[in-house]
UniProtKB/Swiss-Prot annotation:
Chain positions covered by the region annotation Important for dimerization: 224-259
Protein species of origin: Gloeobacter violaceus (strain ATCC 29082 / PCC 7421)
Name used for this protein in its record: Oxygen-dependent coproporphyrinogen-III oxidase
Binding site for substrate: 82, 98-100
Complex formation: Homodimer.
GO molecular function per UniProt: coproporphyrinogen oxidase activity; metal ion binding; protein homodimerization activity
UniProt GO cellular component terms: cytoplasm
Residues where a divalent metal cation binds: 86, 96, 130, 160
Pfam families found in the cross-reference section: Coprogen_oxidas
Amino acid sequence: MQSLQDNITSRLEAVDGEGRFVEDLWEREEGGGGRSRILTEGRVFERAGIGFSEVHGSHLPPSILQQRPEAEGHPFYVTGTSMVLHPRNPYVPTVHLNYRYFEAGPVWWFGGGADLTPYYGFVEDAAHFHATLKAACDAHDPEYYPRFKKWCDEYFYLKHRQEPRGVGGIFFDYVQGDWEKIFAFAQSCGNAFLPAYLPIVERRHTLPYAERERNFQLYRRGRYVEFNLVWDRGTIFGLQTNGRIESILMSMPPLVRWEYNYRPEPGTAEAELYEVFLVPQDWASQAKR
């Protein structure tokens, strides 16, 4: 988990060219700690947060026990790396990654995934992101990608808005079995992130944009905030275990706006986001061979 954080940190600094990550080491009173790294006001990334944590305690919170009641009464150990990148250019999508490992007495599992949230959609980008993650999944089990892609579509869904957060990716949780094989799978998925995302950044970060595109980006960032504060399991877990609030909320965008009863104009790129890209579909099959 720490090497994943290290690799992504160094590559993102190279891509940004100006911004540098500031590291903040922290300890949790109940046990464990972590290292948060944040880049702000970079050339490419307006904010980029990459966190590693390794915490332990006497009992798991209700949000976990609802899913794994057999873990009740056992001390727990959790480690993981999470990341959210908020680019400056509205044509570059926001991206999220999280991979984690839980252990509570005799119970253990892996979870995580990565998903893409564009503001202005490009089929080429969505297809590339999904195809890269699919290849990482297929190397371990051809049933993984369709299963975890569907899970991602269902998980990153704003029920109160009745719309997906973005074009998805993969998501899995409470996965058990052969420890070594599942660990290797999670490792492959983590290593697939940079080749899945950086080509998109390189294609889009120099595209010209104006106030209209910036305002729409800030408006759509509001959906990110809503999901993270209302539905996200990681946020809920952190709050229920007395996690470090600065690290928990590091994923928030630096600027955001809400509009009352916003409706995109028909025939615009903004409308296309809703009509095409916020509709779950088989993106991987649309990748160029």
